[in-house]
Regions:
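Short clusters of hydrophobic/aromatic residues that line enzyme substrate/ligand-binding pockets
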Residues: 8, 51, 103
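Intrinsic-disorder/low-complexity coil detector
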Residues: 12-13, 105
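A short glycine-threonine-serine/GTX helix/turn-capping micro-motif
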Residues: 104-112
């Protein structure tokens, strides 16, 4: 489900926490507003890690920003403006994002491009932390 209830909380210390699109899912556990869900999901952000997030509404981002400030985590927001769709058909879509070109995504929809941008942002952050991740 994510956040403070996520099974990955056993990994200490995490180097990165990734929060994708926050919606009104699992409200009986996570909370009944987007802001409450953001607070619960931001429980995965631990001291000293990098937090990578899907662009959200200002009120949701404020909750996540507060958690990052509280624990000393650096916040990175995926930049959707840098997504350039090259082509799409029934097999998926091809896009450019920042320094990455002609990436093939076998899923359709803008939300899938946004999820890919979050994943690429996380990979870039991990490269900056010294992880060997090639651009391929």
């Amino acid at each position: 489900m994510g956040g403070e209830f996520d099974a990955t909380n056993v990994i200490l210390p995490p180097e990165a926490a990734i929060i994708c699109n926050i919606g009104l899912d699992h409200t009986e556990v996570l909370g009944d507003t987007l802001e409450k869900i953001a607070a619960t999901k931001s429980g995965i952000i631990k001291p000293g890690c990098d937090a990578v997030i899907y662009r959200e509404t200002p009120s949701v981002e404020a909750v996540i920003e507060a958690r990052c400030k509280e624990v000393g985590a650096k916040l990175h927001k995926a930049d959707f403006a840098d997504i350039r769709l090259i082509s799409h058909d029934l097999t998926g879509q091809v896009f450019d994002w920042e320094r990455f070109h002609a990436l093939k995504l076998p899923l359709l929809g803008d939300h899938q491009l946004h999820n890919a941008a979050v994943a690429l942002t996380a990979a870039t952050v991990m490269q900056q932390r010294g992880w060997h991740i090639t651009d391929e």
